[in-house]
């Protein structure tokens, strides 16, 4: 019976296994050859392939079509990984599987970077392959052994008879799947990863890296949660009276592009940001854990005070599992001091599961796109100026409780290569003409000027209130502009931040202090005396 099962299946199984390694040659960065990988990584690859082959066999009972189906799925992941690496300098990782459903819900945020024609071709090609496989390859039948008889040929009275000849087929297929699963699990326990996506992919290969990352994500995070900085933080014995309002602007794709392109962009596009820096409590370049996207990495690092090194697998999407179980953050800490904690993001509240996650992180309220139905847009998203006006109204209408508002802007999200650029935009942001391949930079700089206008508006209105307040502005990551970077060079990847207070403005300006986004929250709170100093911070704002 075993021979009858394996003889017709062994050729497609082995052909598919070899091709599954061959497809990885298309990856960027390219993994090392299979014979140079750790034995455990090879075991995971063979185990996953065996499991997938068995499942396809059980589903379609067409071995060659099953092989083609698995390889097509693998090829799709390879293409997505390469598109991601091209735009974000990072290959596909296990938490990214969630983005397949997000791409259906929010196609504008994803499909432009994969390519609309590529997506249509992939869908159409898979549909054609599905039809061809089902139409051209016969189902495994009694010719390979009476126990392989198909359902279509089985008499109706034996359809649910455990002694019917089809039962051994599924029993053997299940045994094959189980052997693949056991091999993958056993080898996976010996597969070590460093959580540097490119390095792990090159060293282990695609299947082994994805399996290892998935296994790590399923491990308990209780110890990580207990070690969270805000789980053990202590408030100062004496707090400012009154407590200052705290405004944090997490600005989409914000960085001082003049630093990267000093001779190309007009210096006045960030005039208000320069003014804030000249009066700042602290300012400088900000090291963030994202390039071009993945806002929640920077967002969670600020809220939690935890960098990627501490988060392990959760650094890639902390809202996917870790934050969904609750986590002490700056919001929960400020809430314990009596603050009303609010997050404002003019986009769909369910994106990144923020509607479920943010309350668990200590926010009293999360305000999404529903509050901005009539707001002015710049491009497809709510404009930064309209968002700034909303924040000012919140400050003006707040109750006796001090307010902590964390604002996540959306205007400069992109895709920039889909935006229209007119001659007025060129004159507003450029010192000299740019090559046609750099039109994305013009669109980006236009939104950068709008963000700067919002900052100037906030500064003016906050000063008019004559109430203590502290403003923190930082960029979540640099923008996605691959054609610009290829033509005139790419930035380093750091963004910028500024901390500005109403009570202590330094007319002469202070020297820049570069820091990481995980450290920024400590700097921010320490300057207000709301937190016992963590490390050395040379400046403090006295609101008394």
Segments (PLM) and residue ranges:
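Solvent-exposed soluble domains appended to multi-pass membrane proteins
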Residues: 251, 267-544
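Short alpha-helical segments and helix-capping/turn motifs at coil-helix boundaries
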Residues: 53-54, 230-235, 326-329, 390-391
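Membrane-interface segments at or immediately adjacent to transmembrane helices
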Residues: 180-250, 259-262, 266
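Helix-boundary/low-complexity linker signature
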Residues: 14, 43, 243, 255-259, ...
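Short hydrophobic "helix-edge" motifs at membrane interfaces and signal-peptide entry regions
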Residues: 51, 241-243, 465-467
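Short, glycine/acidic-enriched capping/hinge loops at junctions between secondary-structure elements
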Residues: 29-33, 258-262, 418, 484-485
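Residue-level preference for non-acidic, small/hydrophobic
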Residues: 103, 246-252, 407
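Transmembrane and membrane-interface helices of multi-pass
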Residues: 1-202
């Amino acid at each position: 019976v075993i021979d009858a099962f394996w003889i017709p299946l062994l050729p497609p199984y082995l052909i598919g296994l070899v091709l599954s390694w061959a497809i990885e040659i298309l990856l960027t960065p390219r993994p090392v050859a299979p014979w140079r990988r750790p034995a455990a990584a090879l075991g995971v690859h063979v185990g996953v392939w065996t499991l997938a082959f068995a499942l396809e066999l059980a589903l379609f009972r067409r071995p060659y079509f099953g092989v083609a189906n698995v390889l097509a799925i693998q090829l799709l992941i390879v293409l997505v990984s390469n598109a991601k690496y091209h735009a974000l300098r990072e290959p596909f990782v296990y938490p990214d599987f969630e983005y397949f459903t997000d791409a259906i819900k929010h196609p504008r945020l994803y499909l432009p970077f994969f390519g609309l024609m590529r997506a249509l071709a992939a869908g159409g090609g898979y549909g054609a392959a599905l039809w061809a496989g089902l139409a051209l390859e016969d189902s495994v039948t009694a010719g390979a052994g009476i126990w392989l008889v198909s359902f279509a040929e089985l008499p109706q009275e034996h359809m649910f008879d455990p002694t019917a000849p089809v039962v051994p087929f599924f029993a053997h297929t299940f045994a094959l799947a189980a052997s693949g699963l056991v091999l993958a699990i056993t080898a996976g326990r010996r597969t070590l990863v460093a959580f540097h996506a490119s390095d792990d992919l090159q060293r282990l290969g695609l299947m082994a890296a994805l399996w290892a990352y998935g296994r790590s994500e399923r491990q308990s995070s209780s110890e990580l949660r207990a070690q969270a900085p805000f789980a053990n933080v202590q408030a100062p014995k004496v707090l400012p009276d009154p407590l200052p309002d705290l405004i944090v602007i997490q600005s989409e794709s914000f960085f001082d592009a003049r630093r990267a392109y000093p001779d190309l962009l007009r210096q006045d596009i960030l005039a208000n940001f320069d003014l804030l820096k000249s009066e700042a409590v602290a300012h400088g370049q900000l090291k963030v854990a994202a390039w071009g996207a993945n806002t929640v990495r920077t967002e969670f690092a600020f809220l939690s005070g935890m960098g990627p090194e501490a988060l392990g697998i959760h650094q890639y999407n902390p809202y996917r599992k870790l934050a969904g179980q609750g986590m002490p953050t700056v919001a929960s800490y400020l809430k314990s001091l009596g603050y009303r904690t609010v997050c404002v993001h003019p986009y769909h509240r369910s994106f990144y599961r923020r509607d479920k996650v943010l309350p668990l992180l200590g926010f009293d309220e999360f305000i999404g796109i529903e509050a901005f139905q009539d707001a002015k847009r710049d491009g497809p998203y709510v404009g930064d100026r309209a968002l700034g006006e909303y924040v000012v109204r919140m400050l003006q209408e707040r109750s006796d409780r001090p307010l902590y508002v964390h604002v996540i802007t959306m205007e400069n999200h992109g895709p920039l290569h889909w935006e229209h650029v007119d001659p007025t935009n060129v004159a507003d942001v450029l010192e000299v003409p740019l090559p046609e391949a750099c039109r994305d930079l013009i669109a980006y700089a236009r939104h950068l000027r709008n963000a700067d206008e919002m900052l100037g508006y906030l500064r003016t209105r906050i000063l008019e209130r004559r109430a203590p307040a502290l403003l923190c502005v930082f960029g979540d990551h640099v923008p996605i502009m691959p054609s610009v970077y290829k033509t005139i060079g790419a930035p380093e990847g750091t963004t910028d931040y500024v901390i500005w207070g109403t009570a202590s403005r330094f007319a002469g300006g202070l020297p820049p202090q570069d820091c990481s986004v995980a450290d920024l929250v400590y700097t921010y709170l320490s300057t207000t005396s709301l937190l016992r100093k963590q490390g050395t911070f040379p400046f403090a704002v006295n609101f008394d």
